[in-house]
Amino acid sequence: VEAVLFDFHGTLAQVEDPVTWLLAGAAECGVNLERLRATVLADRLVTAGRAGGPAPARIPPRLAEVWAERDLYEHAHRAAYTGLAATVDTGIDGLPEALYERVRRVEGWLPYADLAPTLRGLREDGVPVAVVSNIGFDIRPFFTTWGVADLVDAFVLSYEVGRCKPDPAIFLRACGLLGVDPERTLMVGDTPADAGAVAAGCATLLLPAAAPGRANGLGAARDLVAATRG
């Protein structure tokens, strides 16, 4: 293996817990929510659909088009998630937009504990790295804030390249940017969409779920690279 591709959400970082997310969004709207009410509302908002959260329980017909295109266009990503949040009656004016903006800011995310050590280790080993993400906004500033931007050689974001995982084209684009053959590339992710890299010719490693901010086994990527190099 000569290069590694990493998924972003659920692999390198995770969104903050739903109650913290809601409290922060409400505060932006000038509302200080009582924690018990926040817990109830947060559960309803996550069920409706949160960027970085589980799939929504249902997609209202009026949001079907923007939902289908959420990872291809910035405007669709915003419209989909603010629209889903607006289906929950929270009684707080402006909350859907505030919650969406929270997800777009680095404060709304927690890098996994082994993110920096793994990226530094791969850089020391001379292994180029790309981040390949289905997403509707720019995550590069997150890596700058976390002090690891210089350890990533390329970002391949679905809304910028017009392709989403598991389409092999997005993985091939990443390999091309790194100048490596797919057959000599490892894709590291946490969902079946990431495993779509197999169709592009890449080896694939899927990591288990881990709590935000904890170690989630990223170091296994470096171990696999080392093992293939003998």
What are the functions of these language-model segments?
Residues 1-116, 121, 125:
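N-terminal helical cap/lid subdomain that shapes the substrate entry/recognition surface
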Residues 1-6, 30-31, 91-94, 116, ...:
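Asp-based, Mg2+/Mn2+-dependent phosphohydrolase catalytic module
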